[in-house]
From Swiss-Prot:
Monomer. This is 1,4-alpha-glucan branching enzyme GlgB. GO terms for cellular component: cytosol. Catalyzes the formation of the alpha-1,6-glucosidic linkages in glycogen by scission of a 1,4-alpha-linked oligosaccharide from growing alpha-1,4-glucan chains and the subsequent attachment of the oligosaccharide to the alpha-1,6 position. It comes from Nitrosococcus oceani (strain ATCC 19707 / BCRC 17464 / JCM 30415 / NCIMB 11848 / C-107). The active site is at 415 (nucleophile), 468 (proton donor). It is an enzyme of class 2 (transferase).
């Protein structure tokens, strides 16, 4: 800061008023009175030091500053050339300790007007690079630049151990009408604990808040933000990232293993594994079981373990439960180096009311709507973002980009989209406000979701954005230019609900509910669907997937393998929650590890082996994955055999096909004639009743010859055995065809 840059000296009356506000911690323009200012033929330096009894200006030698005993304001008068810039202030506290500090108020503002303009327009996609806390060097002096958005604050201060958590010590500067406050504090380093102390301009209420843009936080139950170091992580996944740009996800197999990092596995005495340990152990396991992607329940920072991460307070911070941001980078990098994609759940639909978080951030409804009919989820006890506010939308868009860019995340599963789309979601009549057209659609949320998808797909080709949307809202996964929301995929909640409802019924009654399995194909290609058997289905008294199944133990496991056979051969990408792949018996509990001891039992080993081979089958046969989203990839053979509760269908890809036959009763269907599209020899390439998987080993010989008998509208047919509570996959044997290497053939009988 040159002499010409010194703030002009305020008039006496103005100065007196300003100092009164400063001392009372309600002043928005501390640079107006603190730091260096022209004074007569020289300059005056002022420092407000609430805990000092004596102070010196850092000239050579140091010169004592005059103290106003009433308010602890220290002044030094002198010639400009005698003052080094930047300069230090030395001060002694009541305990006799001397402190050496560069004066924050001798450094000019750092945020550009252009950055602030973009943020105000809601178009600063990388605003996380300027707001929050960032280690920087200003005029050769290292320190930390703090910036936050709080337009309804009268005063904002940075507080921490470095200033005894006293909001009088480091008041920030309000940047015009932008609502953004900033201050560079020299000498602070990464690892510093801090919060913002805000005083509301209307009520004078004081609010102590974590940093909305904080990139690291204390471990719960503590809530302070931590100044994060600039990353020095050296990524090794360049090849993966380049290939991702060309990833044809529409026509590639995607099989997702959904994971809660805190309860997948635990260490000694129930301790969390760290990101590095999880990377090595989880990647080895996913490679073994054959999934293509891992989807993480939210790793954004959150205060309550029991929320599973869905009540986020740190939208820019990997949770500190498992390690540092760089250790999370290692986790993602390690996955990529082994050919595994990483998706994460992201929660833009609501946020918690915790006092240290976003709620009433500056004493006003800043991030949320003020009217609870718009701004509160009463069922969940959370608040709803105000999507119509540019800066709030920018906050969320920047968060989404942050995870893709800083951590190389391959996609986001957007949580609770239905709650965003409908103004009357889970509300009684009279407890919601219609939109400007009188409807129940949340127009601002719709615009936000479209903008989110437009920005993410434009800036990061190949990245997936998946909607958890539980209603029949049209065109969720259709392009924006045709009126869609622009998501890559949508969870098929209808398939999940109908299928699990059907599978939970005693087989003797299933023939009455046959349409529960066939109905889904009426809309299966209306969206790009993912088939989810997620964490939500194995909690809150719903039971594990295994114990949703009826019958004795043998039948439960057979039903579970049958369910998985249907899932992996049905149109749509796949998602399976951890533990389901080996038949976890208990409901999921986030406070402890999965029951890995179950893999000591052959029947659980069998379920795991079935998942491994279904994954391999799905990934190896284009007929099972290429047209997951298109009707060209599916044909019924027979959907009408409700009397025997048998379904049969083709999955196809450009002339190649596989046949799937599913028997939903414990009665073996011997001499079951099935129409087929081509003559030749058929091979049974998967049988969920195989002894490999814990079944009864009923099935077919390794070759099945067609008969020239027209059947089910097909020119040829085969005579097969369909095992009890089982599914089989058949493939036409041709000279060019190769069976999947690890999918075992049933030995048959």
């Amino acid at each position: 800061m040159t002499n010409s840059q010194y703030s002009p000296q305020p008039m006496a009356a103005e100065f007196s008023e300003a100092m009164e506000k400063l001392v009372n911690a309600c002043y928005s323009d501390p640079f107006r009175v603190l730091g260096p200012h022209p004074y007569q033929k020289g300059i005056v330096v002022r420092a407000y030091l609430p805990h000092a009894i004596q102070a010196w200006i850092g000239t050579e030698p140091p010169q004592e500053m005059a103290r106003s005993s009433a308010i602890n304001l220290f002044e030094w008068h002198g010639k400009a050339k005698a003052l080094p810039l930047p300069y230090q202030v030395l001060w002694e506290d009541k305990m006799g300790f001397t402190h050496y500090e560069y004066d924050p108020y001798c450094f000019p503002p750092q945020l550009s007007d252009y950055d602030l303009h973009l943020f105000g327009e809601g178009k600063h996609w990388h605003v996380y690079r300027i707001l929050g806390s960032h280690p920087v060097i200003v005029d050769g002096t290292s320190g930390v630049l703090f910036a936050t958005w709080a337009p309804e604050a009268e005063r904002v201060s940075i507080v921490g151990d470095f200033n005894r958590w006293d909001g009088r010590c480091h008041p920030m500067q309000l940047r015009g009408l932008t609502g953004v406050w900033e201050l560079f504090i020299p000498g602070l380093k990464p690892g510093t604990l801090y919060k913002y102390e805000l005083r509301n301009r209307n009520r004078g209420s004081i609010h102590l808040k974590s940093d909305p843009y904080g990139q690291r936080f204390e471990q719960r139950p503590h809530t302070a933000s931590i100044v994060a170091a600039k990353t020095n992580y050296l990524w090794q996944d360049r090849k993966w990232m380049e290939q991702r740009k060309q990833f044809d996800w529409l026509h590639q197999p995607i099989s997702v293993y959904e994971v809660h990092l805190g309860s997948w596995q635990r260490g000694e005495n129930g301790a969390f594994l760290n990101y590095r340990q999880l990377a090595r152990q989880l990647v080895d396991y996913v490679l073994k079981t054959g999934f293509t992607h891992i989807e993480l329940l939210p790793v954004t920072e959150h205060p309550l373990d029991a929320s599973w991460g869905y009540q986020t307070t740190g939208y820019f911070a990997p949770t500190s439960r498992f390690g540092s941001p760089d250790e999370f980078r290692y986790f993602v990098d390690h996955c990529h180096l082994h050919g595994i994609g990483v998706l994460m759940d992201w929660v833009p639909g609501h946020f918690p009311k915790d006092a240290h978080g976003l709620a009433q951030f500056d004493g006003s409804a800043l991030y949320e709507h003020e009217d609870p009919r718009l701004g509160e989820h009463r069922d969940w006890g959370t608040l709803i973002f105000n999507y119509g506010r540019h800066e709030v939308r920018n906050f969320l868009l920047s968060s989404a980009l942050y995870w893709l860019e800083e951590f190389h995340i391959d996609g986001l599963r957007v949580d609770a989209v239905a709650s965003m789309l409908y103004l009357d979601y889970s509300r009684q009549e009279g407890d919601w406000i219609p939109n400007k057209y009188g409807g129940r659609e949340n127009l601002e949320a719709i615009d936000f979701l479209r903008e989110l998808n437009k920005v993410l797909h434009a800036q990061h080709p190949g990245v997936l954005v998946i909607a958890e949307e539980s209603t029949s809202w049209p065109m969720v996964s259709h392009p924006i230019y045709v009126g869609g929301l622009g998501f890559s995929m949508k969870w098929n909640m209808g398939w999940m609900n109908d299928t699990l409802s059907y599978m939970s019924k005693d087989p003797i009654y299933r023939h009455y509910h046959h349409d529960a399995l066939t109905f889904g194909l009426l809309y299966a290609f209306n969206e790009n669907f993912m088939l989810p058997l997620s964490h939500d289905e194995v909690v809150h008294g719903k039971q594990s997937l295994l114990y949703k199944m009826p019958g004795d133990e043998w039948q439960r496991f057979a039903n579970l393998r049958l369910l998985y056979t249907m899932m992996f051969t049905y149109p749509g990408k796949k998602l399976l929650f951890m533990g389901c792949e080996f038949g976890q018996g208990e409901e999921w509990n986030e406070s402890r590890s999965l029951d890995w001891y179950l893999l000591n039992y052959p029947v659980h080993q069998g379920v795991q082996a079935a998942i491994k081979d279904l994954n391999h089958l799905y990934r190896s046969l284009p007929a099972l994955n290429y047209y997951d989203f298109a009707k060209e990839g599916f044909e019924w053979i027979d959907c009408h055999d409700s009397a025997q509760s048998v379904l049969s269908y083709l999955r196809l890809k450009d002339g190649d096909f596989v046949i799937v036959v599913l028997n939903f009763t414990p009665v073996p269907r011997t001499n079951y004639r099935l129409g087929v599209p081509k003559s030749g020899v058929y091979l049974e390439c998967f049988n969920s009743d195989s002894t490999y998987y814990g079944g009864s080993n009923m099935g077919n010989s390794q070759t099945i010859q067609t008969d020239s008998i027209t059947w089910m509208g097909r020119p040829y047919s085969i005579n097969i055995t369909v095992p009890p509570l089982a599914g089989i996959v058949l493939r036409l044997k041709t000279p060019a065809s190769k069976m999947p290497a690890t999918a075992p053939l049933s030995p048959g009988k």
